[in-house]
Amino acid sequence: MRNRRSTGDSGAAQLTFDRVTVQTIRKDFYYGLNFLNVWNGLNHIAVNPMEYTTLGKTGLKVSVAGLGCGGPSRLGLRDSSQSENSAIALIRQAIDLGVNFLDTAQTYGTEPVVGKAIAGMPRDRLVISTKKTLPSPGHSNPGAEVKKGLEQSLKLLGTDYIDIYHLHGVEPQDYDFARERLMPAMVQLREQGKIRFIGVTEGFVPDPSHQMLQQSLKEDLWDVVMIGFNLLNPSARRTLFPLTMEKRVGVLNMFAVRRALSQADGLRGVVADLLEKGAIPRGSTNGEDLPDFIWRQSGAATLPEAAYRFCRHEPGVDVVLTGTGNPEHLKSNVESILKPPLPKNVLQRLEELFGDVDYLTGN
């Protein structure tokens, strides 16, 4: 069954899921609640304390936790640690936890799995974000390549529209090309109803100081941006978030947790390296073990929990993306995103240490 826009009113409608035919509940019911557990025979409705927000000027109601289907894991498919069926189950688990924002991309190779996972679900209760890698600047018709990529994504995802279609990993030297040669095609796709909103994602590893996004946010072209932001590199707080909030551009937060923030020794190594390079003043740590300080002062059970809480409650961040192939990690990560902010003294300490750092990614 191909997922299409809902055309009915707010009353009941008949939908068929495999061999199970159910009477769907009025649309109003879904807002603020979880989705029907369609993959378990529709025998119950799970309600979780997910929080929702409005994604900038798009007006989309999105969960504050989003499932990232790329990253180092790619739902466990990158290193074949998980089967396709396990990846499908993971996506459905995320939805069962209240996540309605799913982010994938052409280059991740996970669009087919996302399509299979959401097949038969109410399409208008999901927000699907995918991306197109930039064609070569020497391409004779790069706009046509963008349109071709969109058609492929629609087919793989089993839908007739994408909520947010991004230009993927745009670097500073490629921004003018993206704006002048590719944006017209994106606008045409939006006018045709094949995409609802236009986004751009930065290449955080080659551009950790956000040069491309600083340039792009000077113009009113983008509905949504994807930004690298974490407690080791909070530079977007100064350079991007004031602009995104002023212009009401939706913000997706990637790189909340990477290798350096997944375990205490990784963070200790980063601090030692920064001290050695003089990036943070010697003595600024007061001889304290930073992971231990964070744990004691915040009550976080793990360093990733603290890192997710840091991002979730940053003014300007709408959706924090989390990616994994492990069901237990997914549950823990979503729970972390839903926990309270870090205490002010912890945030102040982190600002003192990392507030001027704009070249780390956390990898």
Language model features with spans:
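N-terminal binding-site loop/beta-alpha segment at the start of enzyme catalytic domains
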Residues: 43-126, 185
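Conserved, mostly hydrophobic/aromatic
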Residues: 55, 67, 102, 114, ...
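Acidic (Asp/Glu)-rich catalytic clusters
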Residues: 57-59, 115-123, 154-158, 188-190, ...
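Active-site mouth loops of central-metabolism enzymes
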Residues: 71-84, 132-144, 173, 205-206
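Short, acidic/polar
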Residues: 80-93, 142-156, 206-216, 307
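Active-site groove signature of glycoside hydrolases
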Residues: 155-173
